[in-house]
């Protein structure tokens, strides 16, 4: 009788171990690709569009659909060029690691509003939505990286705000580790059309200031772009593992 009980207990423990192992493997598989879809939006485009669109669903406030962005003070590279370079490298790195990806644009000659970009990613069923941008300031000494997400008071982003906040913080911290860039923190913005229309967990990263000569030169270099991509990927993976 005792031997039978021991045998049953051994079988139960073995079964429990198998279940725990399977759950861990499933979580690992999910975080390393398979079911994960990363949507990448290289900010801006070659020509801005000043036509107006709703800032948020049902909002009476309207904004220009999309701008062409800023330009490097030294390199003269346009923001829309830089964001696509980094976006394509990010896509390639993620694919190498087994993730599925969805690009909002792969060329400069498009006309896609910020609202349309968000809706595209909603329809795609993104796990995370990464919006890539670069910053500018009248003060050429200003430098560093920041991330933008909605506040907890935003009625349009309630379902994803908390997760988006975590994704933003994870991407920011890992970006700073990978690049050594100055950490300018998280900016909570409720006036961003692309954020307000998104039903996916999302963040907008301002990778650096194109108005700062040193940072402008850095961001166009292949080596620094690879570091930026490493930081973004590490941030995405940190979020996926801890969500």
What is the meaning of each model-derived region?
Residues 160-187:
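Active-site-adjacent substrate-binding region
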């Amino acid at each position: 009788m005792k031997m039978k009980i021991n045998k049953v207990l051994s079988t139960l423990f073995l079964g429990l171990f198998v279940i725990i192992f399977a759950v861990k493997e499933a979580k690992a598989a999910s975080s390393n690709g398979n079911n994960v879809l990363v949507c990448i939006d290289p900010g801006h485009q070659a020509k801005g569009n000043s036509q107006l669109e709703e800032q948020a669903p049902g909002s009476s406030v309207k904004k220009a659909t999309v701008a062409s962005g800023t330009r490097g003070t030294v390199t003269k590279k346009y923001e829309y060029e830089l964001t696509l370079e980094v976006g394509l490298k990010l896509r390639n790195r993620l694919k190498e690691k087994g993730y599925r990806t969805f690009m909002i644009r792969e060329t400069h000659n498009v006309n896609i509003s910020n609202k349309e970009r968000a809706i595209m990613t909603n329809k795609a069923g993104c796990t995370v939505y990464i919006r890539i941008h670069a910053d500018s300031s009248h003060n050429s000494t200003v430098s560093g990286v920041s991330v933008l997400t909605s506040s907890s008071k935003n009625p349009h982003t309630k379902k994803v705000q908390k997760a988006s906040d975590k994704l933003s913080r994870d991407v920011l911290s890992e970006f700073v580790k990978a690049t050594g860039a100055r950490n300018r923190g998280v900016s909570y913005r409720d006036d961003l059309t692309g954020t307000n229309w998104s039903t996916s967990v999302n963040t907008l990263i301002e990778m650096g200031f194109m108005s700062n000569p040193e940072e402008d030169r850095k961001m166009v270099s292949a080596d620094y772009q690879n570091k930026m991509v490493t930081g973004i990927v590490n941030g995405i993976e940190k979020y996926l593992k801890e969500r």
